[in-house]
């Protein structure tokens, strides 16, 4: 076993590799992957891995040998605090898993379609920035899943949190939390307001008589035996809300880009969904901006996509392969551990680069080609397909996200022609959640 650090670029004597990495992140990773192999160092505490087996090892050892990313204000005690959170978080996952499975098994199909219709009806016929529109949809969908009739205002808080986090996602150095920079103050202010709102909602629901069956995930969490603390319930809600907001929105933005580039694919998806009933709504009938979508906005059930949608599902799987929103997953070593032939120290970061694994010709035929048909036979080996991670921290809402993305893909193709003149030029942006940068589109009602 080698006790030295993995090899890697030395970089600038003062700034290391930060400047070169920020110029073109994926080009930096590709170049040094070719030069140093599947494991290489970025600096003396950070290692990249593009090896599927080692990546699978790291992800499946999370909670034991590793913890998940520590966040923008991680201090000296953050590693210990993250370890302390493992047990309550894993218990919360066990509590909500059955409810999420029910939601994925078409339990929310009608509402997902109704929410998407309401959001897109507000913007139809106008040139719009696609990512904020998809964030609006995903925010309403996950807020309703978690909080049901108490979801009012939550999508707006999720949008504010997303905006407050963006500066951190594009930065390689973070000022300590106590430094009163505008970026820090904004993040702390928005996050505090969100957590205070969730805390009030949890306390108010706790004071109500228990509902059977539970209406939403908050009811499920409050009905756990033994009882969860309000703090644990609030933290769990927050984690699910954030995970169900940014990732589906980024994936849908990539899907919209493909629908604009590939009209034949869009037509095939529309055929699979079947014709929508009724005419396109008039401008006056659309919900006002910012209004929560209502159940009355839903079309007749038979008009919406439903049941198995194999082509739409294959398109989603292929988008998640080519453009995984969680394109890089960070784990932090809890103790001294080994990564292949290398030894890591407590606090060392391992960056698992799903994007490059998904496009590696060793694991995928024609890896850079968009080919939904590959999913008719594809059976990815462990560690080679990681849109939702792996191991004990595999995305809790993966099945819900797949159903939501499949329905949304089908519904957009069924109702709209997507016109996006900059679709080809809107390349993925490798910071935070991977999505086409600056994609603009017009959703035109189909004829």
What are these regions (language model features)?
Residues 5-26, 45, 53-60, 69-147, ...:
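Cytochrome P450 catalytic-domain helical core, especially the substrate-recognition surface
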Residues 5-11, 211-216, 258-280, 292-326, ...:
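Cytochrome P450 I-helix active-site segment
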Residues 245-272, 398-416:
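Cytochrome P450 catalytic-core helices
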Residues 63, 352-379:
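Conserved cytochrome P450 K-helix/beta-meander segment immediately N-terminal to the heme-binding cysteine loop
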Residues 16-37, 302-340, 361:
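Conserved cytochrome P450 K-helix E-x-x-R motif and the immediately C-terminal K′/meander segment
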Residues 13, 101, 191-251:
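Conserved cytochrome P450 catalytic core segment spanning the I/J/K helices
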Residues 135-138, 274, 394, 399-447:
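Cytochrome P450 proximal C-terminal region
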């Amino acid at each position: 076993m080698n006790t030295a650090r993995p090899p890697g670029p030395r970089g600038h004597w003062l700034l290391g590799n930060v400047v070169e990495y920020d110029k073109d992140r994926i080009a930096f990773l590709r170049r040094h992957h070719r030069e140093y192999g599947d494991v290489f160092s970025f600096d003396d505490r950070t290692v990249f891995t593009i090896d599927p087996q080692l990546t699978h090892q790291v992800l499946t050892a999370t909670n034991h040998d590793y913890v998940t990313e520590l966040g923008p204000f991680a201090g000296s005690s953050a590693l210990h605090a993250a370890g302390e959170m493992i047990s309550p978080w894993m218990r919360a996952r066990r509590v909500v898993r059955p409810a999420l499975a029910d939601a994925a098994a078409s339990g929310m199909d009608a509402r997902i379609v109704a929410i998407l219709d309401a959001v897109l009806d507000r913007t139809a016929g106008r040139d719009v920035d696609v990512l904020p529109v998809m964030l609006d949809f995903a925010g309403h969908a996950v807020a309703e899943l978690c909080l049901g009739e108490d979801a009012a205002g939550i999508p707006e808080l999720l949008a504010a949190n997303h905006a407050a986090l963006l500066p951190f996602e594009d930065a390689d150095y973070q000022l300590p939390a106590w430094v009163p920079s505008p970026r820090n103050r904004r993040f702390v202010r928005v996050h505090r307001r969100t957590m205070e709102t969730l805390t009030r909602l949890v306390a108010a629901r706790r004071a109500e008589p228990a509902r059977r069956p539970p209406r939403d995930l908050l009811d499920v969490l409050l009905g756990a035996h033994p009882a969860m603390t309000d703090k644990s319930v609030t933290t769990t809600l927050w984690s699910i809300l954030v995970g169900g907001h940014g990732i589906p929105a980024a994936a849908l933005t990539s899907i919209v880009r493909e629908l604009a580039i590939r009209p034949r694919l869009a037509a095939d998806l529309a055929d699979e969904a079947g014709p929508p009933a009724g005419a396109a709504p008039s401008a006056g009938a659309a919900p006002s901006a910012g209004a929560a979508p209502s159940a009355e906005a839903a079309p007749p059930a038979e008009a919406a996509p439903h049941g198995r949608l194999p082509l739409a599902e294959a398109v989603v799987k292929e988008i998640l392969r080519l453009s995984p929103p969680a394109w890089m997953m960070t784990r932090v070593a809890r103790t001294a551990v080994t990564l292949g032939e290398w030894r890591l120290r407590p606090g060392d970061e391992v960056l698992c680069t799903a994007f490059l694994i998904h496009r590696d010709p060793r694991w995928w035929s024609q890896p850079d080609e968009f080919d939904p048909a590959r999913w008719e036979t594809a059976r990815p080996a462990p560690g080679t397909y990681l849109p939702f991670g792996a191991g004990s921290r595999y995305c809790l809402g993966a099945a819900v996200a797949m159903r939501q993305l499949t329905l949304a893909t089908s519904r957009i193709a069924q109702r709209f022609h997507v016109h996006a003149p900059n679709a080809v030029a809107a390349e993925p942006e490798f910071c935070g959640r991977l999505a086409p940068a600056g994609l603009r589109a017009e959703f035109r009602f189909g004829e």
